[in-house]
Design a protein with these regions (language model features):
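Alpha-helix boundary/N-cap detector
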Residues: 6, 10-14, 44, 48, ...
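Short alpha-helix boundary/capping elements
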Residues: 19-27, 53, 57-61, 65, ...
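Long amphipathic alpha-helical segments with strong coiled-coil/leucine-zipper propensity
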Residues: 1-52
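Extended amphipathic alpha-helical scaffold segments
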Residues: 37-56, 60-73
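Alpha-helical oligomerization segments
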Residues: 63-128
């Protein structure tokens, strides 16, 4: 249904953004491979999971949310606001990670859905 399409779009965009963040400076496939290899050596997989799901949740914020914020703010304020929201999402996930491992979370489960909805609600509360 529509929810799985939204999930798929959000997942693809999260993957694209994470890869762009990790390897945007690579000038060849070999360099890309080296950067990724080094990244996985120096970062725990938890850091990468937090980045991925941070982008996923950011992409998952529904259209209403964006429209709601844009109506209340001008465009340049919105760009700054979206940057703050993204940081807020990453920090929320890091806090969650300290209590419950995100590695073991089934992102298709009700628990994950609650986590996403709670973060969205927190964003509305903090940024309205």
């Amino acid at each position: 249904g529509t929810a799985s399409t939204i999930d798929e779009v959000a997942a693809k965009e999260a993957t694209r953004k994470l890869l762009e963040e990790l390897v945007s400076n690579a000038e060849s496939i070999d360099e890309m491979e080296e950067i990724l290899s080094n990244k996985f050596d120096e970062s725990s997989s938890e850091d990468i999971i937090i980045q991925y799901f941070g982008y996923y949740i950011y992409e998952h914020l529904d259209k209403w949310f964006y429209e709601h914020l844009i109506k209340k703010n001008n465009q340049s304020d919105c760009n700054n606001l979206f940057r703050q929201i993204k940081d807020f999402i990453f920090e929320s996930l890091k806090d969650t990670q300290r209590v419950n491992s995100l590695q073991n979370l089934d992102w298709g489960s009700d628990e994950a859905d609650r986590l996403i909805k709670n973060i969205q609600q927190d964003i509305l509360t903090v940024f309205e």
